[in-house]
Amino acid sequence: MNVPATRKDLMIVNMGPHHPSMHGVLRLIVTLDGEDVIDCEPVLGYLHRGMEKIAENRTIIQYLPYVTRWDYLATMFTEAITVNAPEQLGNIQVPKRASYIRVIMLELSRIASHLLWLGPFMADIGAQTPFFYIFRERELLYDLFEAATGMRMMHNYFRIGGVAADLPHGWIDKCLDFCDYFLTGVVEYQKLITRNPIFLERVEGVGIIGGEEAINWGLSGPMLRASGIQWDLRKVDHYECYDEFDWQVQWQKEGDSLARYLVRISEMTESIKILQQALEGIPGGPYENLEGRRFDRESDSEWNDFDYRFISKKPSPTFELSKQELYVRVEAPKGELGIFLIGDNSVFPWRWKIRPPGFINLQILPHLVKRMKLADIMTILGSIDIIMGEVDR
């Protein structure tokens, strides 16, 4: 009886949803031939909470605390997009000081998000040390957030027409001190990581995406810029007051995991440049458009002295969304975060469609990991930078 020396059976392995490298409750059904990946199927939905449907039963002000639960590591961006949509719909002007404060908060949030990408990404590929260093810097950021907004995470700070509160006394000096300190921290990261031969062995040439391919897949953010496409919505859409600052779009042309790392590291230093200019040039004036509080009231005298109506047992400003539709987007740390809003002359949105960057960037994962080694899945998935809260919504 002849027994074959080798068997060519394919093995199907479940990675996740409770795997330390899955960055949340992501499940990958991986088909393996030995160490080689033949197929990979992501299974989503474990963190689905019906965020779009909830929006249709809440006013914008009531909905604001919910949106910080999409991408819970960069909550300022979800708040920004939530107030930008009704501001554009109602043509509400944001005071210059409020716009500067928003930019400061957005860039601090971008740094915090990139830091918490960097640590776990390095841990995924076997480097534990940076994981502890990033929390040192991130703690300083969260102290700044807590001083300005009262919350370390889930800040609920943005409002239609401005922000919830002005910056406290001494906060700007404290933030400038952080900027000076953090620049030395980024140099330290680059010394520790960028030329490390073991790190380069793991990431160089792994998960290559060409420029045209990135556009065809609808990628955005560092995923797109690492493939040679100089596309940043802060330059393209001119929202808030980014045009008033001197900064450059960071990009690389290689399109591999190393390029995505380099883009994010460079973006942190650019964010510091924007922060320093904004903090030194912040104008005086109101932090909120008080005209925006004088919402359209019914002619009924019963409402003449009230800015609030009771809707589903919660007081909420009577800001009616006019019957039109628009798409609003911001450059979040992970890519293009967008909202498609349809108003219906009601205080509730008729449709609130979320365009999450993580969900769309994740679609290319099966294409990238095919014919790679099993260990490369961690590197490629880590370089995409996903948060399951916004992927599943």
UniProtKB/Swiss-Prot annotation:
Keywords: Chloroplast, Membrane, NAD, NADP, Plastid, Plastoquinone, Quinone, Thylakoid, Translocase, Transport. Its EC number is 7.1.1.-. The keyword NADP applies. One of its GO terms (biological process) is photosynthesis, light reaction. It is found in: Plastid, Chloroplast thylakoid membrane. It catalyses: a plastoquinone + NADH + (n+1) H(+)(in) = a plastoquinol + NAD(+) + n H(+)(out); a plastoquinone + NADPH + (n+1) H(+)(in) = a plastoquinol + NADP(+) + n H(+)(out). It is a peripheral membrane protein. InterPro entries: NADH_Q_OxRdtase_suD, NADH_UbQ_OxRdtase_49kDa_CS, NDH1_su_D/H, NiFe-Hase_large. One of its GO terms (cellular component) is chloroplast thylakoid membrane. The keyword Cell membrane does not apply. One of its GO terms (molecular function) is NAD binding. Belongs to the complex I 49 kDa subunit family. NDH is composed of at least 16 different subunits, 5 of which are encoded in the nucleus. NDH shuttles electrons from NAD(P)H:plastoquinone, via FMN and iron-sulfur (Fe-S) centers, to quinones in the photosynthetic chain and possibly in a chloroplast respiratory chain. The immediate electron acceptor for the enzyme in this species is believed to be plastoquinone. Couples the redox reaction to proton translocation, and thus conserves the redox energy in a proton gradient. This is NAD(P)H-quinone oxidoreductase subunit H, chloroplastic. The gene is ndhH.
